[in-house]
Amino acid sequence: MMNNKVSFTNSNNPTISLSAVIYFPPKFDETRQYQAIVLSHPGGGVKEQTAGTYAKKLAEKGFVTIAYDASYQGESGGEPRQLENPYIRTEDISAVIDYLTTLSYVDNTRIGAMGICAGAGYTANAAIQDRRIKAIGTVSAVNIGSIFRNGWENNVKSIDALPYVEAGSNARTSDISSGEYAIMPLAPMKESDAPNEELRQAWEYYHTPRAQYPTAPGYATLRSLNQIITYDAYHMAEVYLTQPTQIVAGSQAGSKWMSDDLYDRASSQDKRYHIVEGANHMDLYDGKAYVAEAISVLAPFFEETL
């Protein structure tokens, strides 16, 4: 497949260069204008993993797609490394769209966005704020604020996450005094750390040959908790998320409640929900049959709505 690795200045922060790969459809003609889709990776992931998988497969269906590394992560610039600030992650999507609008072969009126896991939540938030996004797709959606407040299966009270806010605050002080940034796992760092099979697969995805990648260590800066805990990826979705929305989630995903929540809260007149029977959260990252089913829903959705 024809692709082009690019690096461009983040329009929100000119000191940061964003690294991305653009995938082109079959028989690409640079004199034409194409529908384009921005792909956002999970928390702790990079463009070479599941975001790249979906970018390639959607490009095969006729779209120009771009998978990128978030600021402070992967091959993109920024210090401290592995900062997971949800507000910056959301703004990165708009920065990538800024870049797309400079490409002659992209139709600026037909740009969509899609994300996996936390990248899906960031995609929803970006669409709430950025009207250039004409349609969104989500796969195994995670509202990162909700999951840190309420747990993987939504069985923890928000007030019980207050110690995390304190931990993030204390980390900022220790970071400055020690000169080293404290970190926290975004997926289990060891197999024995996983509380269930689904999260054991998250460890397997990020830390074994299944999908591990050198620029995806699977952790974030501990100071990120200050922004994560109070963040709501779906804030004002009831009012401003009016774009067509296609949600895809596995029937066995512990995270499915966050896809349910997005569907309930989105004000879109055209919102669709496809459940992949038998799939858990991680299956939709790289399970061949499950990903194929997701693409069979997402590709026609974007073709229709962009």
UniProtKB/Swiss-Prot annotation:
Any matching Pfam family: Peptidase_S15
Gene3D superfamilies: 1.10.10.800, alpha/beta hydrolase
UniProt-listed InterPro entries: AB_hydrolase_fold, Polyketide_trans_af380, Xaa-Pro-like_dom
GO biological process: cell division
Domain of life: Bacteria
GO molecular function: hydrolase activity
Name assigned to this protein: Uncharacterized protein YcjY
Biological source species: Escherichia coli (strain K12)
Higher taxonomy: Bacteria, Pseudomonadati, Pseudomonadota, Gammaproteobacteria, Enterobacterales
Originating gene: ycjY
